Amino acid sequence: MSNLMYNKMWHQTQEALNSLLDKEFQKMSEPQANKVLVFQMLATFYINYVQIFRNMENVYDQIVHPQKRMLIRKVLDGVMGRILELKNEMVELEMTEFHYFDDILQDLKLSPQQLDVPIPRYFLKERLEVIKGREKILARILTECGLNLPVKYAAKSIALEEAVKLIQIAERARQGRLRALFMKQIFLQECRAKEMKLLGHRLLDTKLAALQIQKVWRGFHQCKKTVKEREEEMVFLGMKPSPLFNEVSDAIVQSKQVTNLRDEVQLKHEQDYQEALVNIKEDLKMLEGPDIKEHLQDQIRQWFIECRNLTGTFPDYPNEEDGGSALIFSNKTPEQVMGDIIATQEEEEKLKKKKKKEDKENKGKKGKKEKKEKKEKKVSLKEKAMKDEDEEWKMSPSLFLQLMEEGNSLYKDIWLNKDESWNFPQDYDPELIKEEKRKELEMEIRVQVDELMRQELKNLKLAVNREMEIPPRQKKGKKEQTIVFPREVFGNPRVALVSLHIRALWGISYLSFNNGTIESLYQELVEKGLLIQALKVNLSDYIGEYSYLGTTLRQVAIEPMPSLLDVRQLITLYGILPLGSAEVHERAPLVKSLLLAGPSGVGKKMLVHAICTETGANLFNLSALNIAGKYPGKTGLQMMIHLVFKVARQLQPSVVWIQDTEKTFYKKVPQAEKRFEPKRLKRYLPKLLKLLKPDDRILIVGTTHRPFDAELQPFCRVYQKIILVPRPDYASRYGKFHEVLWKEIILRNGGKLTNSLNISCLSKVTDGFTQGQIVQVIKDVLTERRLRQQAHKPLTAIEFITMMTNMNPVYREEEESFKNWYAKTPLGKKRVLSLTVGNKEKEKDKGKKGKRGKKKK
């Protein structure tokens, strides 16, 4: 698309955002008590914001104007954060992580695919050089250590007699095949000789021969034509995809080329813009700097004279902390400025007196308050739930609405009615840069002018009033205790503070950590196997389909199992979006830890690697088996955690992965695993979570296939969000035209889909099998030899089904055990409680209606 088209798309998206903000501000002022209506309102806002986010992300990725992109980025981060806030509101309202919008999508006339939250492409594009450089360093360290060498499979040693027998069997089989082929050829020759003897006395008629050839040819031609017509009819009726469905069209190839060209233009315009910022500021400093300085001095001198004429004395010059001479030019009279300065001084004195009185009063009241708070906390969960039902619901304050409103107002002021007919290539606008840099230059010059005018005011007071300025008294305070460490210990002051905090929490009395640069620490972690290379897996490779019966099942009081697409959405919302954007991570509801629980083979490990791939994050492996034998002892463990989180903070975003995390929280450690000390991290994980702040883009991700083996309370205390990853449902295994499991994986491994391969039968038969098992079966069937045979021997369903017989599916009992375990988690308990309260209220309403009916009779 052209620049004009993307500009038009941006204007339409801004209009939609403007109307949505108006609606949201209106709804926020109207408290509601009905939870169903509240959820529908939140879900509608959520879906509308997702549509705006999809369009805005596309515009930001393709638009080439550097100044427009800055504004779009601001709005984009605001929309992204607002989506996370609305998701958090829906979770607190429904007490579940999974929501279904079937009815709302139908009302808005949207398809389920339009509900998919995209991953912004700028997460990787703007950090591409950093990510590539880090990958090169990691690859170099791995090659030096010999950790990335291909796995050499050792040959199985067998006895000499067995080897001779194997060779003899193979040789005899080869000779047998040759003998059988030779005998077959002799038999065919004899058959041909017999036919020739029988037909030898008859002369062949040329007309009969021609008719015979025509008959065979016409039959073959008509059969081929019928097959072609049948395929065309199936495509027309929508019962079969078009033959061009899996082929990449020329239009798509051309659009990719245009996209790459736009990326180059975008980069060039950004470089020109950065150069223009420096050049234009220098030009303004040379041309307008002296005039601005002279104008400011004249204004301040005029203020001196006006204040002396009104009050009889020269005024006190405002301090730099209060804004300096900026206070003078805030459209106020000299009397108002003097009044403000005096008022602030009086307020400071009053606050000091109040604090002293409050400190004395609070000492006696502390004990009484603590007793009252303990009594108030002893309210049962059921009473709280009933109170929440009766109270009116109000939306919690948003930190992103103001950001979006600022971006929207800037768009209206600058870009809405701006004439850009002169700017066809969409380069930077120099006038906007001049306005911005003129303000910066004025602030810089004002600081210099303030120093000069303060001295001038002193001289005036000495000359006219004979006054000596009394220097302000320095406030006496407690001396801060400073601890000096060697520079090599903590290069970054922020990391030093964090390290000191860790030492205080864990009671470390001395420094035993490996001191050095981040590069050396990075290399040490790689060599120890704690920092690993993430696999190149995109989140879109986690194939799944939308759950079309979610709302219907919940209306009948049946809790549906989430679909794979629902899991993918949660990974995007809780893992990828906050890690990818620092602005969103600082303001959005903070998610420090994430747990993926589900049977073996459902793709938990793949999702962890997808988070790292989509955000360019480092991957640290602190699994119980991986850290076994490394950094032994208590001090060694503290040193390891310190190193991991120091590097993770410096090179954020980072993901700390704990595979088989139930081992860290075992109820009872198995005898075979006691030597690995799997519970080493159990004590330290809650403390680490407390140290993570909003500006630390670090996510702790745990994966488990046996969560019921762990102690529930400490397990749920560490993991803030728990996502249940299910086995694929029928919609995910089979679909008509969407990317679904069987079709997509067969095509990826070189297979061809034909009429002889019944995908529907495969999807039905493989109910209960996981994605990992399906992938393994397809790889086992589609060998190199089988791929070469596809031209004359198409794939059939029976080939895959026979391979499936050797595998065990996820049985209903195992799935129910995961559901029962999830119902014991904090969010699961709240969900069960809210459902029971809702059912009781429905029964009460039915009873009231029945009594009314009897009275009428």
UniProtKB/Swiss-Prot annotation:
Its main location: cytoplasm. The keyword ATP-binding applies. ATP binds at residues 598-605. InterPro entries: AAA+_ATPase (IPR003593), ATPase_AAA_core (IPR003959), N-DRC_Component (IPR052267), P-loop_NTPase (IPR027417). One of its GO terms (cellular component) is cytoplasm. Residues 365-375, 847-857 have a biased composition (Basic residues). Gene3D superfamilies: 1.10.8.60, P-loop containing nucleotide triphosphate hydrolases. It is found in: Cytoplasm, Cytoskeleton, Flagellum axoneme. Residues 206-235 form the IQ domain. Residues 348-388, 834-857 are annotated as: Disordered. Keywords: ATP-binding, Cell projection, Cilium, Cytoplasm, Cytoskeleton, Flagellum, Nucleotide-binding. Residues 376-387 have a biased composition (Basic and acidic residues). One of its GO terms (molecular function) is ATP binding. Pfam families: AAA. The keyword Lyase does not apply. Belongs to the AAA ATPase family. DRC11 subfamily. Component of the nexin-dynein regulatory complex (N-DRC), a key regulator of ciliary/flagellar motility which maintains the alignment and integrity of the distal axoneme and regulates microtubule sliding in motile axonemes. Component of the nexin-dynein regulatory complex (N-DRC). This is Dynein regulatory complex protein 11.
